[in-house]
Amino acid sequence: MSQFIDFLVGTFANKVQAQSHPTRYAHIRVSHRLIGENRIYGEQAYNYLKNRPYRQFVIDVVQQGEEYHLKNYEIINPQQFAECKNLDKITDDMLKYREGCDVIMRKTGTKTFFGGTSTCECWVTWNGTKTYVQNEVKLTDSEYQVTDKGLHAESHTKVWGSDYGAFRFLRQ
């Protein structure tokens, strides 16, 4: 468990990818901070708006055999925690479990973990359209790769997500 947590905690950015393909990838920073033994606060922000993350969350990491289950929580009124501030003030009553949004990871090499969403029931409304999230995650000691897409609830066609492959975030 400690290796997985060590790989996941930190600050990551896709600056190289965004500079190489500026019309395909925005420059994004992902921060993961340990706030409990196996609990992580996370945020994602455009590099030019680091003080206004577009996504803030808490993850509980639970090991089940060879798998690491990332239990995803929405933070109610998360603004006070932007830029990873006041994290000691996060309490359980501020968190809402996101049913169907767990990510399951497995160790696939000595320094590699791979996984993704475990169901088709992680619901997100995107521009008024009900979608479910599908993602794949690859994690190493130096890189965090994520492919996210939202699929239409009825037609199962892609509504949002990268057309160009994974976001490749390098450890900072």
Residue spans of the language-model regions?
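Short N-terminal edge-element motif at the start of the domain
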Residues: 1-52
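Calycin-type beta-barrel ligand-binding domains and close structural analogs
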Residues: 7, 15-17, 21, 48-172
